[in-house]
C-alpha cells in the first residue's frame, strides 16, 4: 500500500506538471499575438531624407537619401539581413514588380545596415535594383525593433520559413539579423511617405498590390507637377 504522504507528493507533482504545461501553452498563445511586439514609430519624410547613404562598390560615395526619390519617387526596401533566406524571398518578390515600376518611372532601391564580406554581392541576384549602405540604420528606425527568442514560438514565422524553403530560397547566418526591416514607397519632392511597411516578425512581407497602388500615386503626382 502507498503511504498517504507518497500519494500527496504524487498529487502535488502532478498538479505542478499540469500547471507548468498550462503556463507554457498560455505563454505560446500570448507570444502569437501582437501583445509583446515592439510598437512601431512611423518615420517621417524629414527623418528619412537627411539620412546619409553610401554606394557599395569600388568607389563608395556618400549622399543624402532624398536624392533617391526627389525627382521620381522610389520604392525602398530596408533589408533585415542580406544572407537571410526570408529577405532574399522578399527581395525576389519586389523585383517581380520591376517592369511595372519601370513603366511608372519609379526606381527600386534597397538599403542594408552593414556590409560584411560578399553578403551584399550574394544578395544582389535576388534584388533587381541598386543597394546602398545605411550605416546608422535610420531606415530601420526611428525606434529600432528587435525580434529575438519570441520569433521561435510564433506560428507565422514558421509558416514564413516553410513558404520560403518551398520556394527554393537558401541563406546563411552571417551578420546582424535581429533588427527588423521594412519597405517604403516615397513620393517625389515633398509628397511624403505613401506606404510604410514595418516587418512585425521574420518574413513578414509587404503586400505587392499595395506597393504598386502607392507607386501609381507617385506617377500621377509627377505628371501633375509637370503640367
Curated annotation (Swiss-Prot):
Any single Pfam family the record assigns to this protein: AhpC-TSA_2
Compartments where found: Cytoplasm
Alphabetical list of SUPFAM superfamilies matching this protein: Thioredoxin-like (SSF52833)
InterPro entries: PXL2A/B/C, Thioredoxin-like_sf
Highest taxon listed in the record's lineage: Eukaryota
CC terms in the record's Gene Ontology section: cytoplasm
Active site: 84 (redox-active), 87 (redox-active)
GO molecular function, one term: antioxidant activity
UniProt keyword terms in alphabetical order: Antioxidant, Cytoplasm, Redox-active center
Keyword Cytoplasm appears in the UniProt entry: yes
Location of region: Thioredoxin fold: 13-111
Keyword Lipid metabolism applies: no
Function: Involved in redox regulation of the cell. Acts as an antioxidant.
Family, per entry: Belongs to the peroxiredoxin-like PRXL2 family. PRXL2A subfamily.
Protein name (record): Peroxiredoxin-like 2A
Source organism phylogeny: Eukaryota, Metazoa, Chordata, Craniata, Vertebrata
Gene that encodes it: prxl2a
Amino acid at each position: 500500500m502507498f503511504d498517504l504522504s507518497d500519494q500527496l507528493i504524487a498529487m502535488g507533482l502532478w498538479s505542478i506538471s499540469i500547471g507548468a504545461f498550462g503556463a507554457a501553452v498560455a505563454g505560446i498563445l500570448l507570444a502569437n499575438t501582437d501583445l509583446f511586439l515592439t510598437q512601431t514609430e512611423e518615420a517621417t519624410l524629414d527623418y528619412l531624407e537627411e539620412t546619409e547613404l553610401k554606394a557599395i562598390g569600388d568607389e563608395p560615395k556618400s549622399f543624402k537619401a532624398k536624392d533617391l526619390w526627389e525627382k521620381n519617387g522610389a520604392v525602398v526596401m530596408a533589408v533585415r539581413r542580406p544572407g537571410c533566406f526570408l529577405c532574399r524571398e522578399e527581395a525576389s518578390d519586389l523585383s517581380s514588380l520591376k517592369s511595372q515600376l519601370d513603366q511608372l518611372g519609379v526606381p527600386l532601391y534597397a538599403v542594408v545596415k552593414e556590409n560584411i564580406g560578399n553578403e551584399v554581392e550574394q544578395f544582389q541576384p535576388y534584388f533587381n535594383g541598386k543597394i546602398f549602405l545605411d550605416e546608422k540604420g535610420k531606415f530601420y528606425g526611428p525606434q529600432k525593433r528587435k525580434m529575438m527568442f519570441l520569433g521561435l514560438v510564433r506560428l507565422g514565422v514558421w509558416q514564413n520559413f516553410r513558404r520560403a524553403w518551398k520556394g527554393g530560397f537558401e541563406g546563411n547566418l552571417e551578420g546582424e539579423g535581429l533588427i527588423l526591416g521594412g519597405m517604403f514607397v516615397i513620393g517625389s519632392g515633398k509628397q511624403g511617405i505613401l506606404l510604410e511597411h514595418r516587418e512585425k516578425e521574420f518574413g513578414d512581407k509587404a503586400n505587392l498590390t499595395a506597393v504598386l497602388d502607392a507607386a501609381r500615386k507617385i506617377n500621377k503626382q509627377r505628371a501633375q507637377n509637370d503640367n
